[in-house]
Amino acid sequence: MIEYEDFEKVEIRVGTVIEARLNDKSIRPSIILIIDFGEVLGNKKTSAQLTKYYKPEELIGKQVAAVTNFPPKQIGKMISEVLVLGFPDEENNPILVMPTKKVNNGGKLF
C-alpha cells in the first residue's frame, strides 16, 4: 500500500492538445502531441500510441490528463516531457483520460 503522501507527489494535470501529428519516425504507430498546460507549465511535448482510436486532427482542442512531474524521457528520437494517461481496452490499446467538462489548463487532479 502507498501512503497518501506518495499520491500527492504525483502531479496529474490537465492540458489542451494544441498540435498533433503522426510520428513517422517511431517503430510503433504513435502521435506526437503538444499540450498546453497553461501558465502553470506552458506547452509540453510527448508521444503516445493512440492511433487505434484517435486521428491527430481529432485530438486538437481536446483536454487530456498527464503526469507532469516525471523527468524527461527519450522515446525514439524525441524527448517526452509528460506522460499522457489512458485506460486499456480489451486489446491493451489506450483510451485517453479526458475531463467531461472544460476545466482550466494546468489544473491538478485531487
At which residue positions do the language-model features occur?
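Phosphate-backbone binding interfaces of nucleic-acid-interacting proteins
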Residues: 1-110
